[in-house]
């Protein structure tokens, strides 16, 4: 039996959102939209009002909150300008994921263009781990920078910030993680702090970094410092950090993707080339092409490669760095596959799948354990922890399911852990080797308890029912007005009932292609990364949920449904 066959086929159940036909009619009339698109919008809670107008035609001017509403932003901008103009030196310390690296690059690039002396520091994932550390603080002081500006961490770095203060550094923290208590920074920017709530706390570090640039540009009055020119970097973190693509995030992502399509940054041009991305850039291109290559640097070697790539003005250097990131990503994929297969073997050898999955091995590469944990959740729909060994202790990464908060789960198991942190969907921790088995048992027991109160089967929420005859190329183009798509703004999911399976074909030994008919019309239904499905049998009558798309192959265009769920029709 191959490792792929060890993965169970977790079938998704179909749910239909509550329908509001009268509101759909009003939307169709007010905005000249098709009945189908209007039904989707009304099912998502939209009314024919200003909010829907801003959604359909998002603009920077009308759709973004005032920067001055972000607590302490004005003070930070004033102080950074003061330090920059006095040549006192500004050191940026950022995380090694796409959000931290794009946010750090964005602010660094702005400061460089403003003529402010600055430098970027990135922690080493393997020897130092996440967050601000003593080495960075001392290096900042050693190299003559008087301000330490953190991006994507700092909220919980009390000890390191106190050291910075002892060394005479002025500290500014820009972060978006959960706040228990404010850190000892001179200026603290975090929407989650008491008295803030800016943009409902949904902005990632790159988004906050862009807002900092907006505030700085208003004080420096230089055409080269137009904040719109930095949206290509801001959108990278916004999309890859999986924040809700609603409100300000959706506008940053949308305008950023437009900039990215025509970017002149040598690093992004080179990266697009190795990804095979041309003019039209979508969220998928960032999520599955550009993002993984940027992440590969921090996972496999050092995030500093990304800072170099995103900020260089040398096209030849950018080309070399992009190729290096592409190679690192291939290595990351191979390493991920090895760790995933070993984890699957461990789970299979234990018999029944537990409520909480824990897989560990001293040889697991700690740069990919988070991705593998997510793959296990996708396979089994159970909270999953994957652990590797590094620096004399086990380091773990956890991914959860809907209804189970990972950070609360880890908090309940803190007696076994040296450190832990995270949020509802994901978290990380470390523990001593002697505690691993005890942790695995406790993790399963706690998950067993938590899963009694949550759905243990994944589901797909259909926005509306549609007839196959309604699906036309014009409708598919109209549905693109929902883009950019992502967390909090998924692609319109259409429910088509009682279609007959006319034919089934397996493509590249990996993907199912079904020919579906309502008796009059035909459409192809694709189930990606699925070799078989119990409902997809020739002759069956099925209900399907998926995204309508147009597949262009060798110049031929045909309508296609990318299927998320299939059930035998009642």
Residue positions per predicted region:
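Active-site cavity-forming subdomains of large catalytic enzyme subunits
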Residues: 138-202, 206, 210-219, 246
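Accessory interdomain/linker segments of ATP-dependent helicases and helicase-like nucleic-acid enzymes
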Residues: 457, 462-523
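OB-fold/S1-family single-stranded nucleic acid-binding modules
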Residues: 554-570
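Short nucleic-acid-contacting surface segments enriched for D/E, G, S/T with interspersed K/R
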Residues: 531-545
